[in-house]
Design a protein with these regions (language model features):
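A signal for specific C-terminal beta-sheet/loop modules enriched in small/flexible residues
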Residues: 1, 47-53, 177-182
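Short, flexible coil/linker elements and helix-boundary hinge sites characteristic
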Residues: 2-5, 49, 65-68, 143, ...
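Long, compositionally biased intrinsically disordered regions
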Residues: 3-18, 204-218
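Domain-level signal for Mg2+-assisted phosphodiester chemistry and nucleotide/NA-binding surfaces
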Residues: 6, 11-120
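Nuclease catalytic cores that cleave nucleic-acid phosphodiester bonds
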Residues: 110-218
Length: 218
């Protein structure tokens, strides 16, 4: 899959090109999902007895939107992917492509639509959780958006609980999906297990899990 610089729409200002939401939006806590990917790599390399490559970003995004309700036989146009990361962090360690600078403003296109990436660094006056909540709320309030998929840090802090509270007021015509590594308290949204999409992106096949290689004898 090739990532290329996205061409801005003619007749639109710089602000309009960068602030309008598409019908489908993915919002991600970048360091959190990178940490989860690392843990999966370590565990499955031990279990399967083979090297696990870095997660394929394009493949992961495809799996997210399928879990988020986009039909595989009905492409939905543009998908905005917002990667929220700490200011002192320059890249993923367990995804390819990895660099936030290289991903920002880039896009790839496949049978599910055009995925347009924005990498947003957290400034000193806010926190990553607060920024993610602000972005998610902006998306929910946007009339253009039909589907929102959020990957928050559901293991540390109260970001997940604050999202639950905020989404109580979400319009019924939006499909909202939160991703976590285990079932979490529900609300006005769908839930999906984050590990399934990451396993696909890491190239871990279901058949391998059904018949893993024997552990080496001591």
């Amino acid at each position: 899959m090739y990532f290329c610089k996205r061409i801005k729409k003619k007749g639109m200002t710089e602000k309009e090109n960068t602030t309008l939401w598409s019908e489908n939006v993915i919002v991600v806590d970048a360091e959190y999902v990178d940490r989860v990917a690392f843990n999966l790599i370590v565990n499955f390399e031990r279990m399967l007895g083979r090297k696990i490559p870095a997660a394929d970003m394009a493949r992961w995004c495809d799996c997210l939107v399928l879990d988020g309700g986009i039909p595989s036989d009905h492409p939905e146009g543009i998908v905005s992917v917002v990667l929220i990361h700490e200011k002192d962090s320059a890249a993923f360690e367990n995804f390819v492509p990895a660099s936030y600078g290289e991903l920002n403003g880039k896009a790839f296109k496949d049978h599910l639509g055009e995925f347009v990436f924005s990498a947003v660094a957290v400034e000193h006056l806010t926190t990553k959780d607060d920024l993610l909540l602000d972005v998610a709320q902006s998306v929910v309030e946007s009339k253009e958006v039909k589907r929102l998929m959020v990957v928050p840090n559901s293991e540390d802090g109260d970001c997940y609980d604050l999202l639950r509270q905020m989404l109580r007021r979400a319009p019924d015509d939006k499909r909202i999906t939160l991703f976590a590594m285990q079932p979490m308290p529900g609300g006005n949204f769908h839930q999906e297990i984050l590990g399934y999409s990451l396993m696909q992106a890491l190239g871990i096949r279901a058949a391998e899990l059904e018949d893993p290689p024997p552990s080496p004898s001591l």
